[in-house]
Curated annotation (Swiss-Prot):
PTMs per UniProt: Binds 1 heme c group covalently per subunit.
Tree of life domain: Eukaryota
Protein name: Cytochrome c
Organism: Manduca sexta
Assigned protein family: Belongs to the cytochrome c family.
InterPro entries: Cyt_c-like_dom, Cyt_c-like_dom_sf, Cyt_c_1A/1B
Record keywords, A-Z: Electron transport, Heme, Iron, Metal-binding, Mitochondrion, Respiratory chain, Transport
Main location: mitochondrion
GO MF terms, alphabetically ordered: electron transfer activity; heme binding; metal ion binding
Listed Gene3D superfamilies: Cytochrome c-like domain
Any one GO cellular component localisation term in the record: mitochondrial intermembrane space
Listed PANTHER family: CYTOCHROME C (PTHR11961)
């Protein structure tokens, strides 16, 4: 399938509006309600040091990349049943692509 190309600036706005209340992205950023996302591309689910994940998240065992994140962000509770993340998801493919484009840049 492949993830469509996203717009970093639109993704940043989405992050601020929909994600920043629970997540940080900068190196050394604090965990909030959700984990700091720095360096999460290429990491397995439930692996950010110092964050208390649900058993479901730890057990999922997938590696975060564009494709897995694209599917997850559409409906987190469907992708990882039992996740603590209360976010309902982004139904529009272009919004998910924009957010992923931003996260790829912001979490390096």
């Amino acid at each position: 399938m492949g993830v469509p190309a996203g717009d970093v600036e639109k993704g940043k706005k989405l992050f601020v509006q929909r994600c920043a209340q629970c997540h940080t992205v900068e190196a050394g950023g604090k965990h909030k309600i959700g984990p700091n996302l720095h360096g999460f591309f290429g990491r397995k689910t439930g692996q950010a040091p110092g964050f208390s994940y649900s058993d479901a998240n730890k057990a999922k065992g997938i590696t975060w990349n564009e494709d897995t994140l694209f599917e997850y962000l559409e409906n987190p509770k469907k992708y990882i049943p039992g996740t603590k993340m209360v976010f309902a998801g982004l139904k529009k493919a272009n919004e998910r692509a924009d957010l992923i484009a931003y996260l790829k840049q912001a979490t390096k």
